[in-house]
C-alpha cells in the first residue's frame, strides 16, 4: 500500500542567510530583512538578524549562535487580478489559469485601502499556504473628495487631505481638485504625481 511520506525539511545554517530568504520558525513564516555576523574578541561568534512575520507584518530582532540551523521555505509570489469583494471575501483571478479564489480579509488587513478592481496584486505563498496579499506598488486613482484648490496654489504650497476612489485618505498638494487622477505609492501612502 502507498503511504504518504513527509518531504525532507530543508535546513540552512546562519552561514547561508540571505536577505529576502524564507524561514519557518515554530510554525510561523518569516523573511529575513537583514542580518549581521558578529565575532567578538571573547566568546563565540553569533548572528544578529531581523525577520518579518509574513502574516502580520511585524519585524522581530533576534540573536543566535553562529551555525544555528533553521528551516528554509520557498516563498512563491503569484500575480493575480483583484476582481471584487462581496463583503465576506475578496476575489482574485489567477492571470494564467483564470481560476478565481476567495481570500479572507484577514490576509489583506490595512492594505484593503489600496485595492482597486482589475489591478494586478501579488499573493505570497509558502508550502502552498497563502500568507498575504500585496497591492501594486503604485495605483492610479481618482480624487473623490477634497477641498477645492484656489488661484495661486503652487506645488510648494503645502498639502491637504483628499479621499481617493478606494476610500483611503491621503495628503495631496493644494492645487489638486476633486475628479483629478493621481498616482499613489501604496508602500508609503503618499501622492506621487498628477496624471
Predicted regions and their residues:
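Acidic-enriched and Gly/Ser
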Residues: 8-165, 169-195
Amino acid at each position: 500500500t502507498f503511504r504518504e511520506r513527509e518531504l525532507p525539511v530543508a535546513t540552512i545554517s546562519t552561514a547561508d542567510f540571505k536577505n529576502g530568504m524564507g524561514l519557518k520558525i515554530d510554525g510561523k513564516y518569516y523573511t529575513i530583512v537583514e542580518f549581521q555576523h558578529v565575532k567578538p574578541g571573547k566568546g563565540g561568534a553569533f548572528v544578529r538578524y531581523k525577520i518579518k512575520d509574513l502574516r502580520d507584518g511585524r519585524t522581530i530582532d533576534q540573536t543566535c549562535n553562529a551555525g544555528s540551523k533553521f528551516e528554509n521555505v520557498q516563498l512563491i509570489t503569484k500575480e493575480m487580478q483583484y476582481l471584487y469583494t462581496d463583503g465576506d471575501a475578496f476575489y482574485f483571478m489567477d492571470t494564467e489559469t483564470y481560476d478565481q479564489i476567495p481570500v479572507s480579509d484577514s490576509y489583506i488587513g490595512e492594505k484593503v485601502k489600496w485595492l482597486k478592481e482589475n489591478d494586478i496584486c501579488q499573493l505570497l505563498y509558502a508550502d502552498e499556504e497563502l500568507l498575504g496579499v500585496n497591492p501594486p506598488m503604485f495605483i492610479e486613482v481618482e480624487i473623490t473628495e477634497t477641498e477645492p484648490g484656489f488661484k495661486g496654489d503652487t506645488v510648494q504650497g503645502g498639502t491637504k487631505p483628499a479621499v481617493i476612489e478606494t476610500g483611503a485618505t491621503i495628503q495631496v498638494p493644494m492645487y489638486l481638485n476633486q475628479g483629478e487622477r493621481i498616482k499613489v505609492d501604496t508602500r508609503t501612502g503618499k501622492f506621487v504625481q498628477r496624471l
